[in-house]
Amino acid sequence: MKIYNTLTKKKEEFVPIEPGKVRMYVCGPTVYNFIHIGNARPMIVFDTVRRYMEYKGYEVNYVSNFTDVDDKIIKKAVEEGVDANVISERYIAECKKDMASLNVRPATTHPQATQEICGMEEMIRTLIEKGYAYAAEDGTVYYRVRSFKDYGKLSHKNLDDLEGGKRSLLVSGADQKEDPLDFVLWKPKKEGEPFWKSPWCDGRPGWHIECSVMSKKYLGDEIDIHAGGEDLIFPHHENEIAQSEAANGKPFAHYWMHNAFLNIDNHKMSKSAGNFFTVRDIVAKYDPMVLRFFMLSAHYRSPLNFSAELMEAAANSLERIRTAVATLQFKAQNAEDSELTEQEKELLAQAAGFEAKFDQAMDDDFNTADAIAAIFELVKFANTCGDAEHTKAFWEALKEKITTLSDVCGLIVEKKEELLDADVEALIEERQATRKAKNFARADEIRQQLLDMGIVLEDTREGVKWKRA
């Protein structure tokens, strides 16, 4: 398995720190609004990386944080007249709903920055003691960038470059700094902002220290993979390396993975630019699996341009897989239940060749576009087998191959058995009758039964209305 490492700018064979185990940290969202589909790309991409690692037999400790204290969160809280934690907790919950809709599995741990303040103070104290950080008169603590000789190794920039083009990203409160490049580890409180007591001042942590500390706590000083969007390479991930390696005295992450942007009209999607769609916007129009399929239709390091045409193409492609799976299921239900024939064993051996193609694509830096192409080759092969009579075991084996590979991509391709409209109406009529008979317990049971099957009821003056969830 080879991974493109941003640190070395080349594909490298993946060798875990501990055989059979993977320690992986993915930078999560700042929770001040609903996530947009640009935020969803790294969630889907690195969830797929995790799934493939597990498919290959690795035990993956997958950590993805929520940044729950930030200027944007505070601004939103002021606008609504509520505490900042009300905003962050609201949008953490909403983010988890969106992730679930996209079949992004929960991380092993989802740490929140505000719950790890003690660890941040401890790392800052260590950095000061080692000479990598210093406190200014007002209590602001800065990282001494020039003290870390490898600074710039991830973004492949030297300090002279940073003095120029990237300087604006680093400079703030320059009057107190020893050097314009130094960045904040701890900042003093402002009126109306959340704060924590510290040895330096009442305040809150800088953004970069949060991930260094959460990664250390839940994964250790050294990790296998650190991942996120390419916009995080500098300054965020560069600063994480400086903090973690200076504090811990060990290499931080062995492999750095970064996904390219999701664009609209060839411009990066962002809330600040106003050119974005939320995940909610899209799943209101499309099956969430269509969005996931679309995200995986290109290599994660390639920019991806969002359009209605590409979403329709993704929907059609996904339907082809689902139709094949449904057809195989139907054939299995109506086939003879006997052992595989020799001919069927040979056919399944041919099918295994497409599984090998899938693995080959994923082993090459998680090339999901080619991996999905291998799934379609398997679908085409299954369709060519459809004209002949085969055993139940054969059809089930073919179906399992397609569903297994689809599941590695996080794609749900088996349709849930849906109630026919007539069945729904019949249950609603029964519920109405039980309510008239004042058998409210049974009426509630029917409502719950329908809800479990994805049917939502709404009692109105005009009668009962229903919809599929």
Where in the sequence are the language-model features?
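Structural preference for alpha-helix termini/caps and helix-kink/transition segments
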Residues: 268, 275-469
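Short, glycine/charge-rich beta-strand/loop segments that flank catalytic centers
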Residues: 66-70, 92-95, 105-120, 138-147
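Short phosphate-binding/catalytic loops that engage adenosine nucleotides
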Residues: 58, 132, 455
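N-terminal, positively charged nucleic-acid-binding surface of large information/translation enzymes
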Residues: 8-13, 17-105, 462-466
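The substrate-binding groove and active-site-proximal loops of carbohydrate-active enzymes
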Residues: 78-84, 108-114, 229
